């Protein structure tokens, strides 16, 4: 999603872009209750990813979402191909979108990459989730993006 086409980015730039009609105030309020709530809703991960992209730190959410998709791959060959792609983009040392994981987790992935299972990236995904929950999620809740969306939803709800 490019910044030019992102509805949340346009809304933050005071353009006349409205949130999707099926995004509710209740959902936006749920995001502030817990990181788990944010990630479990339809639009939460999308808005959070847009925020992280604006911060130039979206590799964690992109990796997390890619892992969610990866876990659903049934075909062995597709899984192997996708696992190698995930490794090259996010796990390989010095890769442009390298995520911050410990060497033990990285080594386990390297050992399992030739015959990857659905859970091959599970530990790395948990680590990334924890980083997001502790670091960028509190900043997101205080961000102009979230505050503006919340205010817009509240004013739309008062009609």
Swiss-Prot record:
A GO MF annotation of the entry reads: GTPase activity
Key words, A-Z: Signal transduction inhibitor
Domain RGS as annotated: residue spans: 34-150
Query: Which Cys pairs are S-S linked?
Result: none
Q: In its keyword annotation, does this UniProt entry include Calcium?
A: no
For biological process, the GO terms are: G protein-coupled receptor signaling pathway; negative regulation of G protein-coupled receptor signaling pathway
What does UniProt give as GO cellular component? cytosol; nucleus; plasma membrane
Q: What Pfam families does the entry give?
A: RGS (PF00615)
Looking up InterPro entries in the UniProt record yields: RGS, RGS_sf, RGS_subdom1/3, RGS_subdomain_2
Q: What does this protein do?
A: Inhibits signal transduction by increasing the GTPase activity of G protein alpha subunits thereby driving them into their inactive GDP-bound form. Binds to both G(i)-alpha and G(q)-alpha.
The protein in question is named: Regulator of G-protein signaling 13
- Provide the gene name from the record: RGS13
């Amino acid at each position: 999603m490019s910044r030019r086409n992102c509805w949340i980015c346009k809304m933050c730039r005071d353009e006349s872009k409205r949130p999707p009609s099926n995004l509710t105030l209740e959902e936006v309020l749920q995001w502030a209750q817990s990181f788990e709530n944010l990630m479990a809703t339809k639009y939460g991960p999308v808005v959070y990813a847009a925020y992280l992209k604006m911060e130039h730190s979206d590799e964690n959410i992109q990796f997390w979402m890619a892992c969610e998709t990866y876990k659903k791959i049934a075909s062995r060959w597709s899984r192997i191909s996708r696992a190698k792609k995930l490794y090259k983009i996010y796990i390989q040392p010095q890769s442009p979108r390298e995520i911050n994981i410990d060497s033990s987790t990285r080594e386990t992935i390297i050992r399992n990459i030739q015959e990857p299972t659905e859970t091959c990236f599970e530990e790395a995904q948990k680590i990334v989730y924890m980083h997001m929950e502790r670091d960028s999620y509190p900043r997101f809740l205080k961000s102009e993006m979230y505050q503006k969306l919340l205010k817009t939803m509240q004013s739309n709800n008062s009609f």
